[in-house]
Amino acid sequence: MRYALLIASAIALLLSSTPILLADETVSIGGSNAVLLRPTAPRASVILMPGGDGYIAAGPGGTIGKLKGNQLVRTRNAYLARGLAVLVVGADVNLARAVDYMAAIKRPVTVVATSKGTLRVAHGIAGGAKPDTLVLTSGFLTDGSGSRQNVANILGSPRLLPRTLVVAHRYDSCRFTLPAGVEPFIRWAGGKASFKWLDGGTDSGDPCQARGHHGFNGLDSEVVSAAAGFH
């Protein structure tokens, strides 16, 4: 009898610590499709904004047709496994509406953007989006990153910037997201931003694509751990 009770207790503990997941679904945010993944009882929400042209080709039933190799797209289920409600958005989704949508599911809402997605999130925040926190990975941060198009220049001042985490690879060789842009961004943010350096992993192919250090190839768990824990 005692053994049976111990087994029952262990099963109950396992079930209570494992999030119950709903089926992936395609949802409309202001007329644009996005992909929603969520547990029945999320502890927080994340909005994932991939790089490149930003178009994920969200199809029926939560399918994603493009940018499947993008670091944020390929790790979306890892955020879900951590008990987070996850919204993967394309470039055509209005960020302010996306934040409001996820806030209705569970706050805090963290936007995680990578590469060119960091430009889109900056425009979204400048346009009125108000996430609780922000994570920028392989970001177009400052002029030191290698491009005049960057988060600091788009926002102009850190007044609208939420609490922010920068995740960067020490050896990112993409000419638009160079490591040299990180420390100037931290100074510009005036106490609103912190940073995490990663190194290691595998570097191959185009230095601005997902298989290089720019895309944290081989370091997905480290990126997810940092981003999912920042809220």
Over which residues does each language-model region extend?
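C-terminal catalytic histidine-bearing segment of alpha/beta-hydrolase fold enzymes
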Residues: 192-231
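Bacterial N-terminal signal peptides
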Residues: 8-17
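Gly/Ala-rich beta-loop-alpha elbow adjacent to hydrolase catalytic centers
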Residues: 112-121
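Alpha/beta-hydrolase active-site loop
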Residues: 70-72, 88-106
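The feature captures the conserved acid-bearing segment of alpha/beta-hydrolase catalytic domains
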Residues: 139-200
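Short, surface-exposed "cap/lid" segments of acyl-processing enzymes
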Residues: 40-78
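A conserved short beta-strand
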Residues: 129-143
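N-terminal cap/lid segment of alpha/beta-hydrolase-fold proteins
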Residues: 22-41
